[in-house]
């Protein structure tokens, strides 16, 4: 028996570049980036994908980001819609201000209040949180546990997270250069995205499959063979060939090495065009997966893939380009990975 279709009824994306999906895609196709020094903490000279419009006092930076996302919705949310909220660290700025609250639970409470949907479901699965939430929603819809679901993902830039990735030696000395031979680390960013999903169509697109696993190779490093990431890719593709891959592409040495190894395993006769948002936006943590799906759907609709920002010398085997490329189909594969060995793949298709 074929699983019911999961239709995408609406999308939203808020980044430092723009506050709509359309405007973000235009900016990405132009190769624009948003890297700057933050004003809300001392980054010790490091650049971040920072939204200065979120600066201020009186409430959490996360609350301002969620309100900006809610204000950007250009679709109606049906009565009875369930809320699924994804984040890596939540309202981490509350902790930095001396508040001992549970930062991810506070994030959920903010989301419930701002979107006016009670009894939300929190998903926090490191940097795979966004797509993990989307996969959970797909299962809930297909089992008839809800009719409509609003899945959101958001994370902010913070001193806490910057210091943590710095301690791991994972931050770039300049800016992230995904899939480049001379990449030297990631750049952190902030943003939010939302998808309204339902088994009731039609919509502007659909999520056709999702799969997740854990390779348990290391707490913070991926399995360099890419074997388990390749496994989830094969599971969601089911023999089909996507027009492009929206990769996790952090710009760290190990992540990109493992990802290219996985894609070469899955596509031995030629890798589809590959692109990572992180060269433009930085690593937005729990928002990353949903930004990839929301913006990826628009790429698929336009049949255009943006140029890879930061690219100078492509890694061997990586099908990346510093110019926009046309897509042969409106089918895309989106990848997320997270600390602890998490691997996630989602396939989507434009209507």
Kindly give the residue locations of the regions a language model identified:
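Glycine-/small-residue-rich "gating" segment that lines the acyl/pantetheine channel
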Residues: 135, 157-203, 319-327, 348-349
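Cysteine-centered functional microenvironments
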Residues: 5, 12, 118-135, 177-189, ...
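Extreme N-terminal starter segment of soluble prokaryotic enzymes
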Residues: 2-9, 330-331, 343, 350-351
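Conserved catalytic cysteine-centered active-site region
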Residues: 1-2, 35-64, 90-140, 145, ...
């Amino acid at each position: 028996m074929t699983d019911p279709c999961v239709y995408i009824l609406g999308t939203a994306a808020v980044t430092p570049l723009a506050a709509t999906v359309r405007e973000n895609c235009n900016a990405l196709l132009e190769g624009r980036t948003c890297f700057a020094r933050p004003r809300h903490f001392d980054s010790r000279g490091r650049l971040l994908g920072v939204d200065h419009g979120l600066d201020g006092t009186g409430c959490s930076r996360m609350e301002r980001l969620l309100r900006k996302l809610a204000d950007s919705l250009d679709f109606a949310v049906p009565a009875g819609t369930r809320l699924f909220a994804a984040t890596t660290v939540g309202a981490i700025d509350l902790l930095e201000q001396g508040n001992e609250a549970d930062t991810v639970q506070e994030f959920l409470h903010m989301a419930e209040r701002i979107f006016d949907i009670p009894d939300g479901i929190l998903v926090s699965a490191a940097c795979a949180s966004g797509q993990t939430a989307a996969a959970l929603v797909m299962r809930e819809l297909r089992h008839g546990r809800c009719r409509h679901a609003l899945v959101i993902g958001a994370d902010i830039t913070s001193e806490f997270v910057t210091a943590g990735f710095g301690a791991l030696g994972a931050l770039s000395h300049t800016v992230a250069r995904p899939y480049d031979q001379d990449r030297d680390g990631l750049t952190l960013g902030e943003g939010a995205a939302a998808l309204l999903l339902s088994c009731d169509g039609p919509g502007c697109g659909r999520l056709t499959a999702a799969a997740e696993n854990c390779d348990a190779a290391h707490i913070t490093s991926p399995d360099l063979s890419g074997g388990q990431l390749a496994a989830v890719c094969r599971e969601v593709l089911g023999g089909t060939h996507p027009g492009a891959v929206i990769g996790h592409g952090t710009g760290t040495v190990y992540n990109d090495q493992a990802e290219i190894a996985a894609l070469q395993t899955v596509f031995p006769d030629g890798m589809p065009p590959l692109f990572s948002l992180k060269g433009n936006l930085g690593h937005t943590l729990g928002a990353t997966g949903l930004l990839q799906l929301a913006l990826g759907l628009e790429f698929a609709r336009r049949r255009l893939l943006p140029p890879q920002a930061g690219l100078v010398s492509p890694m061997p085997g990586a099908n990346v380009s510093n110019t926009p490329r046309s897509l042969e189909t409106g089918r895309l594969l989106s990848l997320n990975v997270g600390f602890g060995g998490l691997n996630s793949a989602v396939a989507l298709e434009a209507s």
